[in-house]
Amino acid sequence: MHEKVYRGIVASPGIVIGRAYLLDRRKIVIAGRRIEEVNIKDEVARFKQSIDLSKTQLEELKKRFSKGMGKSHLYILDTHIMLLEDKMLIDGTVKRIKESRLNAEGALKETIAAIGLKFDTIEDEYLRERKRDVEQVGERILRNLVGHKQESLSDIKEEAVIIAHDIAPTDTLMMRKDKILGFATDAGSRTSHTAILARSLGLPAAVGLENITEAVKTGDVVILDGIHGVVIVDPDEETFLDYLKKQRRYKYFEQELEKLKTLSAETLDGHVIKLQGNIELPEEVASVAEHGGVGIGLYRTEFLFLNRQTLPTEEEHYNAYRLVAEKASPYEVVIRTLDVGGDKIGFPGIFEKEANPALGLRAIRFCLQKPDIFRTQLRGILRATVHGNIKILYPMISGLPELYETKRVLEEVKKELRSEGKAFNEHVEIGMMIEIPSAAMISDLLAAEVNFFSVGTNDLIQYTLAIDRQNEHVAYMYEPLDPAVLRLLQRVSDAAHQARITLAMCGEMAGDPIYAAILLGMGFQNLSMNVASIPWVKKVVRSVRMQDAVELASLVMRQPTASLARKTAENFIEERFPDLVAEL
């Protein structure tokens, strides 16, 4: 039998070879049915009992795992527990039971689908992927409704590579590392909580393979290449031996990376770079430190708004930000203000549906049109500044008028707090995202108004190249090293250094080791990324001289195409540390 190769998405790096275990995680197929009015009360009670049972199960899991792995990975369970208390989920299902006379299963499925639609149009991939958390919680409730017990991964006795349609974060927590070598799934993305948890636990994984469950049966020999998102089924002898060598080399390299965690990200000639983490929840702060990061370069605040029917209060804002500031102290925490549109945060009817939300009323535009929402968040952030080193980051600023207006609102909020006798840091630093080409083009003007720039490459690349990277027909054109993108980045860097303000990056580009030396050479001082990328980028930083990085950036900038720029970067990396290239 010839080997078969399946390509998906890199979720968590690593190479494992073993026998497959096909896990049944297909969704329960249950048709909704109408019920009689006399049964409505009982159906609502049945649904609420299932909610309570689901909550009990997750609380027990949390208690069980808190002893062995500490608190840094348990925030995902907290997220699922919070979803079980979500008003949109509970009230939406109860309403459908009462008004549409649907059974609990049918009402729940309709509610989950309706909530999912809100997430589908969110531009931010990380936030959009939270839809999977809602679906996974819904699946748990549904299984409890019908009394369908799920096969537990903790029961697996032999070493295996798990193959499944999808895997919930709770499944990942139950994976015993002495038995579960890694996993591959049909569904999923790099930003799913399952993928994030796999990286945090050091469990190799590939997701988004589409039909891997149809190609593999339990007992098949498989190679899981989590570095490239590849699964090889029934490998031939040459491939098998080649991957054994790669596996040994990777394990050695991992041990070398582990040694770097407590060391600073310092070039060979003494230039120190801040490597920081992107987070969503307070519980993720510990993981940043565990991976050798120094603070939070991007704290997404949208979680406070999503999946609810009431706006977060000032106290909710304050408590969330205070907790992160205290956990991260003495390092800095960069808090990004709300970065989605009004139609995505659970308050229908605020605005009409937009034909093109990516270019519509979102982020700072939304905040300036809804000043009450914006001011409440700013009050919470400012009050939290007394608890740590907090900085404020404004997203999607396109020009000076927006920036002037945000500064005016902030000054008004400061004045309010002073009059109320509420403490805050009067000198809190203010920064703005550079993620729109217009902002990059006038970055010299904008730099005079802020303390720092943070470049959001995900949107900047999409807007510059007019590409939707979720569109499979044009996604191949999404290229960070496109000459147009590089010239904008250099323009922003020149403006920041001329104004003597800090230059940071918090997009995916910041966490790619291939780009690290280029960004150093372009003058970036802070790089914020997914925590699992920190050791890899630190390896590059500690292996290069700043002079060489500047030379590389200049060389890459002179290339006429993205492919030539990439080849130039790869050659540079390979010449200086081939052991790293072998693992990329």
Which sequence ranges carry the predicted segments?
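Non-catalytic, soluble scaffold/interaction modules
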Residues: 1-327, 333-340, 370, 374-378, ...
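Conserved alpha/beta-domain cores
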Residues: 254-584
